[in-house]
């Protein structure tokens, strides 16, 4: 038993100094493939892209036909035919096409941000499951020990070898371990149900019970440069700045005169009149304040992007410091448990009658509380690391 504990602690220590295989990847890959949420977001993205490519062409041509009865009838009837096509100023089509491409980029970044949030949620569920899976192993072992003690105490109680107090303590300890295992199983089932929901309703299991943490570089600013470049939410805000700047150029082009070109014909008995028509609009008030609005939106986009960057920097800087402190705590707990693995010694001392049942249960409780704290600290470390490295999902 002691060797098993030491090997587990050794794995935790190695995980702090080296990055192992990604234990979450298989589950995350399944969720990315089966998630109904992601499928809906993909369809929404395609709809947005199609919408952004709509309205890039000139307006529909207009055709008119007129038939006028003459009076008196001897004058005959008149027929009018006209065909007209209206055009925006040519540069407007150039800017609309480029704006469409930029809007599609923004839509892709928005999808990537929502995808990252979903994958991060799934990873956090897995991290919680690792904790409860490990805790389940600990308390299953405790339950086994409690069952053996309760059975032995019951036999001794029947023969009068022990007092009622020790017997009651053994029974209560056994019931307590049963309830604790049941509580842990309920939490594991809840988390497994969350994973199944994220996986589009398809059953998925995650039985890993050991963490394999990554190692962060010492310098936060160097690391943040990578995180900032890869964070979809910030990429989206930066792309929105480009969109707003392109809208300024488009609003200027829309403020220029519109052109129209067409054909017109008038036909009366004995006389036909036909030819081309050309028109130009006078841009007086239709697009008034559009350029001002576009500039204001551009300034707002830049302010939002800068604000988001500052918040993101401070949030990650806090997480970065938290991770460093948690790593120290994990090493402290792991070293203490490695040097003071008392479970085997306590079992031996109790079986030889060197310590009472009360002392044995008290010492075991103290020992497993420390073990649980190690697991909790390891879980908190992994959750913080998950947020720090979410842009890599």
Predicted regions and their residues:
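Amphipathic alpha-helical coiled-coil segments
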Residues: 40-52, 114, 118-141, 148, ...
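Bacterial Sec-dependent N-terminal signal peptides
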Residues: 1-25, 393
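Transmembrane beta-strand segments that form the barrel wall of outer-membrane beta-barrel proteins
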Residues: 61-71, 95, 256-267, 278
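Solvent-exposed loop/turn segments connecting transmembrane beta-strands
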Residues: 44, 68-78, 240, 264-275
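A glycine-/polar-enriched beta->alpha junction
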Residues: 33-39, 46-60, 82-99, 109-116, ...
